[in-house]
Amino acid sequence: MPLNDFHVSEPYTLGIELEMQVINPPGYDLSQDSSTLIDAVKPQLTAGEIKHDITESMLEMATGVCRDIDQVAAQLSAMQHVILQAASEHHLGICGGGTHPFQKWQRQEVCDNERYQRTLENFGYLIQQATVFGQHVHVGCANGDDAIYLLHGLSHFVPHFIALSAASPYMQGSDTRFACARLNIFSAFPDNGPMPWVSNWQEFAGLFRRLSYTAMIDSIKDLHWDIRPSPDFGTVEVRVMDTPLTLDQAINMAGLIQATAHWLLTERPFKPQEQDYLLYKFNRFQACRYGLEGMLTDVYTGDRRRLADDTLRLLDNVTPSARKVGADSAIDALRLQVKKGGNEAQYMREFIADGGSLIGLVQKHCEIWAGQ
């Protein structure tokens, strides 16, 4: 299938997707009934979209095109209210977090959707194991070449985005010792990690054509890179963040990515080259394993520095851009988070260390999402 032309969109506009957990109290395992909830919610929506994701325990909230994080907040808040009301009526819970801490992948039912069923046929049990929950942020671009530059620029900060949003320390009833275990689930997929190197949109079109020869790629949606261009939307989509426990954190991460995109496209601080990616997976691993305490290695100098310190440097660099796009409150909140030295994975471990159970942890996450 040929690649569609890159749709022109207003630069720096946002679109947010949140993959939410549908929970079945009182045991607080994942429910297998998201279809009922989605059917109940759809007629009540005034903005955005609620839809299926891979399995019946997942629900995706997606905003429309938003100018700034205030519009993102308004749309997500409205959807959250409608979903929580419907969930209560159906005796279900909703929560964030990148993984459910004790669900068993063998129990997960793939949605009755042609695309997901085809994916199940291609990837087998890997699709059931991919019952994990992420936040995706789309940023508008004026053209395909800008999108490729932006993708390469944002790739420098994949570890920072992972470390700030890490919220998946528990899987299958065990502490994984990772801050973000969710991304490990995708390591067996052939398109895991960074996009193969291209320098412009024309080269990307050639890459896509070659990938389509595998008969596993029908559209850009079948590629699960950490960051990917989305020509139909005219965006670059960042896909490495865990779904947070609160809307505030989701909005803050969106604001950071918007501000970083503005800084990258206006200042052009990097000249992308293929060597930039030589240590990409090592630095990504550090962020997944240790969060903000991970160590970044500079691919050119060999210098090593704490992710927390480099994240503060990133926040300082993008602060002027954040003011221009209306995301300065997000940068301030994330700066405070880094200085306090934590992320949501750390909070989860503290809950368990204080005597809480994994069931109690999911219950607490539902209460947090409901604002209780």
Swiss-Prot record:
One of its GO terms (biological process) is modified amino acid biosynthetic process. This is Putative glutamate--cysteine ligase 2. Keywords: ATP-binding, Ligase, Nucleotide-binding. Its EC number is 6.3.2.2. It comes from Salmonella arizonae (strain ATCC BAA-731 / CDC346-86 / RSK2980). Homodimer. ATP-dependent carboxylate-amine ligase which exhibits weak glutamate--cysteine ligase activity. One of its GO terms (molecular function) is ATP binding.
